[in-house]
């Protein structure tokens, strides 16, 4: 994870333009912009000692990701403050282009008062019907991304 960059870093001078696989490295600011451009992401967390991946609709609010959760394993992970990953992507399989962004951080449950305030300002609406939704926050502690670019734009040899 030596190429993971903290969200708070303003400039990145040591990071190469391409990684060893000749994928273009996306800056932290661009990662957040790309995450804001899609409505769905994959929450990756531990459930019963094993990795679990759940599709959720979400919003990026500053350096946090927020989403609704009903009672269950995602909410319990937030109540424990688990470290999780959150992945978003767009892929054009026909043209072999696309990008992926992964954010890592701790989950938390948003208090009822703060959730009410956020719901007034953010256009967050769960895609699933929920009787008792809880607003969950992922505080982004690191973010990294890669872009698959056309062959002509990639370096000819490894970096």
Regions found by a protein language model. Give the residues of each.
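Short beta-strand segments
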Residues: 38-70, 86
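Charged, gly/pro-rich active-site loop segments
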Residues: 2-23, 85, 90-159
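Amphipathic coiled-coil/heptad-repeat helices and related helical stalk/stem segments
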Residues: 27-28, 71, 120
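Short, surface-exposed beta-strand-loop junctions and turns on beta-sheet-rich folds
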Residues: 73-75, 152
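Short, basic/aromatic recognition patches
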Residues: 17-42
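Short, acidic/turn-prone active-site loops that include or flank metal/cofactor-
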Residues: 71-73, 90-91
